[in-house]
Curated annotation (Swiss-Prot):
NAD(+) binds at G102, V103, V104, G105, D106, T126, T127, K138, K147. GO terms for molecular function: 3-dehydroquinate synthase activity; metal ion binding; nucleotide binding. Belongs to the sugar phosphate cyclases superfamily. Dehydroquinate synthase family. The keyword NAD applies. It comes from Shouchella clausii (strain KSM-K16) (Alkalihalobacillus clausii). Catalyzes the conversion of 3-deoxy-D-arabino-heptulosonate 7-phosphate (DAHP) to dehydroquinate (DHQ). It catalyses: 7-phospho-2-dehydro-3-deoxy-D-arabino-heptonate = 3-dehydroquinate + phosphate. This is 3-dehydroquinate synthase. One of its GO terms (cellular component) is cytoplasm. Pathway: Metabolic intermediate biosynthesis; chorismate biosynthesis; chorismate from D-erythrose 4-phosphate and phosphoenolpyruvate: step 2/7.
Length: 358
């Protein structure tokens, strides 16, 4: 399956299919001829699949492997990778290939966007979550106190998504990626949301053809939003539904202590509750709480967190305007909007959530 992605800066395709990794090198060489190729991966992916990707090239590419986990989205690792590019004499005709999950995609993409003021790169995601981060051109590294704060917009030349690679993912990584897929239904496509509820009663029961349809549709929805607002001046902010609180949770717990998507699921439930303060629409929150619980999500705020500290973290969100927290809310299922929300209301709801843990 192919999805066309059109932005103001670039047009490219995302290919979603089973077994495409085995021919990925030839595909990349035909699509983006280069003076040299560099594959960036993490230890987990490299141990399983790096040889398959390397052997698919006609000429052996350079490889750079980082530790798995959010700690690799740092300035220290960024500098190491940029120095490696210089050592291996990558030039402006080179192509960097991000082969991994969202961390690798962000790191490799940020280096590609800044090395020599920008070289081409290709996304080869290996997690369900990375269906989201691999499309749209947002690439960044973290600051110790805030996620994705230092970055650029740098669109890839292509996205190659081999769904066979998802077979080895642990269940918590399925939950992480699936939350971002459901998010797209919540904010932009109620019919897709209904199809997901009907098709996925359990994450272990997704058929191969439905998995490809699900990923391709999610990419298409995001591509449509990004095509209308590449640099996030308007509706692209809707993709941050659930993320204002999610990023605060991740920072408070320490990056890597909870998966991004599981934090987003908690953040979406909070945003649902907040949305109900401003709409008379029936958002069917209880139905979605029941479905997510059946899928194995814990939608409660993690124990031991402080409402005041979470609120302070939320003020570091990129949507914040003049110190005011801007939240993505639902007008109805399939339709989102942004709203500046009084911090006293946010604090009240956070304290309710933390006080309601049992």
């Amino acid at each position: 399956m192919f999805v066309d992605i059109h932005t103001s800066s670039k047009q490219y395709k995302a290919e979603v299919g089973s077994g495409i990794l085995r021919e990925a090198g030839k595909t990349i060489e035909a699509l983006a001829p280069a003076s040299s190729y560099l594959i960036v991966s993490d230890e987990n992916v490299a141990n399983r699949y790096l040889d398959v990707l390397v052997s698919s090239f006609s000429k052996e590419p350079h490889t750079f492997v980082v530790k798995a986990g959010e700690q690799s989205k740092s300035f220290h690792v960024y500098e190491q990778l940029a120095a490696f590019c210089l050592e291996k004499q990558l030039d402006r005709q080179s192509v960097i290939i991000a082969f991994g999950g969202g961390v690798v995609g962000d790191l490799a993409g940020f280096v590609a966007g800044t090395y020599m003021r920008g070289v081409r790169f290709i996304q080869v995601p290996t997690t369900l979550l990375a269906h989201d981060s691999s499309v749209g051109g947002k690439v960044a590294v973290n600051l110790p106190a805030a996620k994705n704060m230092i970055g650029v917009f740098h669109q890839p030349e292509a996205v190659l998504f081999d769904t066979e690679l998802l077979a080895t993912l642990p269940e918590h990584e399925w939950r992480s990626g699936f939350a971002e897929i459901v998010k797209l239904g919540f904010i932009a496509d109620a019919s897709f949301l209904a199809w997901l509820r009907e098709t996925v009663p359990a994450l272990t029961s997704i058929k191969a053809d439905n998995l490809q349809k699900m990923v391709a549709k999610a990419i298409a929805i995001k591509a449509d939003i990004v095509g209308k607002d590449e640099k996030e001046h308007g509706i692209r902010a809707h993709l941050n539904f659930g993320h204002t609180l999610a990023h605060a949770i991740e920072a408070e717990l320490g990056y890597g202590k909870i998966t991004h998507g599981e934090a987003v699921a908690i953040g979406m439930r909070f945003a649902f509750r907040l949305s109900l303060r401003f709409t008379k629409e029936d958002l069917r929150l209880a139905d979605y709480e029941e479905w997510f619980s059946a899928l194995g999500y814990d939608l409660r705020l993690p124990a031991g967190l402080s409402a005041q500290r979470l609120l302070a973290r939320m003020k570091s969100d990129k949507k914040t305007n003049a110190g005011k927290i801007v939240m993505v809310l639902l007008a109805q299922l399939g339709a989102a909007y942004t709203k500046t929300v009084d911090e006293h209301l946010l604090l009240e709801l956070l304290e309710e959530e933390l006080g309601g843990r049992s």
